[in-house]
Amino acid sequence: MCFNLPLPHLPPYLPFITSSFFFFSFFPFSLTNTDAPIEFETTIIDPAEQTSHHVSESRPTHLSFSSSSESPRDQSREQSSRDVSASPVFPKRQQSLLRLDEHMAGGAGESRDEPHGEPSDDAHKSRASSTSSSSSFGQSWNQSSASQRASVSSMGGVDVAQKRPGPSSGGLTGASAASGMPPAPTSQAPAIPPITPQMQTGAFEQYTPQTAPPIPTQSQLGQDGRKRAATLDRQQQYVPSYGYSSPANGERGGPTGGTPGGTPMSPGGVAHVTSPGGGPSAASVHRSFSTTTPHAPTKNSRRIVSTSAAPMRKQIDDANAALGRAVDPSRDSQPMQSRDKRSKSISSRGGMKGVFSNLVSSMGTLSRKNTTVRRSESDTSAPSTPKISGPYDAKHVTHVGFNFDTGEFTGLPKPWQKLLSESGISKVEAEQHPQAVMDIMAFYTDQKDDGVWQKFGGANQAGSGATATTPYNAQNGFSPIASPGATTPTLGALNLGTPLSVDLDTEGDTSTSTGGGGGVGGGDYFAKPRSAPFPPAAGGGSASSSTATLGTGATASGGATTATPAIPSRDRTRESSLSSGTSNQGPPVTPLALSQSRQNLREEAPATPEEKPLAHFVASRKAPRPPSASPKKTGGAGASGDSGAGAAPPSAAPKSPPPRPPPAPPLGVPSVHAPNSEYRQKMITQLEAFNAKRQQERAERHAQKQKLAAAHAQAVQRQQRQQQQQQQQQQQQQSAQQGAMPSVMPQMQHGSMQQAQQSVSGGSSGLTPQQKQLIQQKQLLELQKATGGQVGGPVTSSTQQVLSNPAAAAAASQRKREQRLRKDQQVVARLNQICTPGDPTKLYRNLVKIGQGASGGVFTAYEVGSNLSVAIKQMNLEHQPKKELIINEILVMKDSKHKNIVNFIDSYLHGGDLWVVMEYMEGGSLTDVVTYNMMTESQIGAVCRETLLGLQHLHSKGVIHRDIKSDNVLLSMRGEIKLTDFGFCAQINESNLKRTTMVGTPYWMAPEVVSRKEYGSKVDIWSLGIMSIEMIEGEPPYLNESPLRALYLIATNGTPQLKEPDALSTIFKAFLAWALQVSADQRASASELLKHEFLLTADDVSTLAPLVKAARMAKIQEKNEKAQR
């Protein structure tokens, strides 16, 4: 009889599955599903009556038992057992079925599982071989276990509900406890055994198990949970296991729960009990259900093969020996099998089940795929959102702020971000002090817009390095001599090393000075002797200068001199000057790799006729240096490839002959010099070939350009002739119609064409500059269109707009020009009121140029009559970007007559130039003294005292200098100290006691100036403190940083730290601490500092005279060495 299994969780194609059930019902197979009841078929026989009964029962696959009291279901099961026992099938009450839960029925035997399916062929063979031995073992078992049967009978039958072992049983229940057999382990869950023919020859007793516990999740199944879950979908997690006792006649045997020898052992370790008559009167069925955690499926998951203890194996062997059967050595490893006929049906049943399972799983997968496809189709079928175009020609104006919640800037422009990253200000530093960063960036933006980064900025600096020097004269002492005239390196349009200004106040509070040294000393008063470093940018600008700043390596490339980003400390220069006396050598010039490669080729290769073109080529292209084992002599090389600084000139020593070739190496040893010569020859050949190819390409391009120019000229001439002919025809027609009176329009057209022709031929003298520029732009546009962009580049939209609407562009430029002219006229009118009328050339003689600025030069002269040496600043007003600042400086100098301030003598307007005559300070600036000398604390105190006296005078008149630094402190040869450069001065009055303009040089700026707070005269005291550090260490703090980062450090760090504070006295450190207070309210004033103990012990200014002379001699020596190189 066969059975059908309902599957409640199958997909919607259940009708197909149901029809398949009826089709497969002809085949004996079993199929289970998770949480689905399974229908068992059992045949019960009575050996005494030789009758059999078929009983079917439906049971859930997930089973469990209660461990304590009997549930109502257990009571119903017991009642069903009594009913069956009362039937003719059970004539004797003593034959009772023992049921145990597998939780407590585990014994010492091992268990092996098979996959969910039918046993293999080996299992069938093992089961068939154990059928006959099981019956004989039953007889020996009945004869040798009377006491055990009595013990079991005394128990009155052990019900399955009594599952938990008590303390008296020692963990064994039922017959297992009576026989002394150890319990089976409980860690493995037995699987469902196959329905074999032995099931048709045994006693049956109705049983209804309890509800199973919850199914464990995949995470509880162990590391291979996914594999287990895939198998458990087809296998029951809580499965029953069966043990059967064989009939007495041995015709139908094969217990499935015992050993291969036929031991009636259930997986739970309970022996089957026979009748006390000595033979089995009835076969009893034992079923045990496992509630343990499901185990991993193995090859034999449908049956449990339990291995009994050693005594039980001995009994099995004795029983087989009594029957005359040999002991199967593989009985422990081979599973038991039923008869061959039944095993075939079982095997076929398992195969059909596998096919059906695969069919169901594949159809389930197909259903899921169809659901996914339908869902995706529904998603894609939805109407797409219409795309809305963004705004065009939009301008986004944002306010730069800081979000304290996220710690980031809001609305920060990209140029600001780039400048911050290039200046070395990290994101963390910017987030820590956002307000300081915003103030600094706003200041830099204003400086770039105003273009006032240097005091004479905006003019062409070509030839700014021309200086006239006068050697030392024994009679007259030191003649006027220029200080190192190195212009400041620029970063784009910004000159970062010179004083800065942002004019946000009144007209008089503008921040551009008229010169680097308002009171002219022995130096370049426009070009500062020390420049600030480049920010660490990839594409920094270069400075055109004839003289490099001291301590800065210079590299000559194409006739230009560029300053390196890092400015070394001046300590090395001062130490070298002290150690070597006055013969101070300049720093070595950075050698060019180009000249190195050429010099190496000349030294290694003999002179050849091809050397001249090769040298010409190498001078403009860098060649790789050949490898060499011996070190090469390197040094600075100029354009002519000479050796570095300190080496003798080429004419001093004759050129040595080429070295002899090295001796040949022994046989078998490769020469290390051969690759050099081969490489050198190869390089020479390649360079010659490349040079020839390059010259050929240049010649071809030149010829092509000439052809294009000739074709364009011919086209223009042809077009002009055609236009002339047309105009002549029109004029003739009009003259014929109107008689002798020609029309005005043809004359205008003819005149315009004549002007165009004259402009082409060079006779455009009658046109205005605007008309000439417009005609040139039109011609360039035509040439670009004719050549396709090869000449003049591609046509841009801006050029077309200008040409299409030249009137608007001309009107805008005209308005700007008129505004500038009106402003200049106002400045000139104001200067005429201030300046003295007359010709300065008749009042001063022997003008000697000692410096060159952006908008003028600095001269020394002698006053006619008094023979007084004076300094004259000559400025071209047309090239001066901030003309109103000149007025500010002249007015401040006129009103400030003091022994510590460079005195103003007179001013003149002559030939469009402004002449400012001032006192001449031949000692130069304090920068020279600091650079070439080491100063003592007493000498530093003298400088501070004299500077404070000058500041006290300015502050008493309501004037703030705002640019105190060593460059603006001049000395005489006697050591006298005076302040200069009053271009940044600001007037403080009762209505305007505080200023907010950010002006000055970054490294000397006070924190309140950097942060753009209100400030007063105490900003000069902070700058004095920084200048004191400059005299101690040779340079101001943060000089090796970019100006932008220096401003950030000033705003965030406050008082700078000294490099060696222990080397200073306590009084000096107290003086610096008072002058460098971050809070302006706690900072001392000029009058208070003059009373400090440090200044009371300072030396006289006469002690500075030797330092001035030493600095002058060191500068002369340096200039001579540079001239020789």
UniProtKB/Swiss-Prot annotation:
Q: Give Gene Ontology CC terms.
A: cytoplasm; nucleus
- Spell out the reaction equation it catalyses: L-seryl-[protein] + ATP = O-phospho-L-seryl-[protein] + ADP + H(+); L-threonyl-[protein] + ATP = O-phospho-L-threonyl-[protein] + ADP + H(+)
Feature: compositional bias, Basic and acidic residues: 51-60, 71-81, 99-125, 600-614, 694-703
Biased composition, class Polar residues, residue ranges: 197-210, 233-248, 287-309, 358-370, 576-599, 795-804
Please list the residue ranges that the record marks as compositionally biased, kind Gly residues: 251-261, 514-524, 635-644
Domain CRIB as annotated: residue spans? 388-401
Q: Biased composition, Pro residues: where in the chain?
A: 651-668
Q: Tell me which residues bind ATP.
A: 850-858, 873
Q: Where is the Protein kinase domain?
A: 844-1095
Q: ATP-binding as a keyword?
A: yes
The record ties this protein, via InterPro entries, to: CRIB_dom (IPR000095), CRIB_dom_sf (IPR036936), Kinase-like_dom_sf (IPR011009), PAK3-like (IPR051931), PAK_BD (IPR033923), Prot_kinase_dom (IPR000719), Protein_kinase_ATP_BS (IPR017441), Ser/Thr_kinase_AS (IPR008271)
Give the family per the record.
Belongs to the protein kinase superfamily. STE Ser/Thr protein kinase family. STE20 subfamily.
- Quote the protein name from its UniProt record: Serine/threonine-protein kinase STE20
Source species: Yarrowia lipolytica (strain CLIB 122 / E 150)
Q: What is the lineage of its organism?
A: Eukaryota, Fungi, Dikarya, Ascomycota, Saccharomycotina
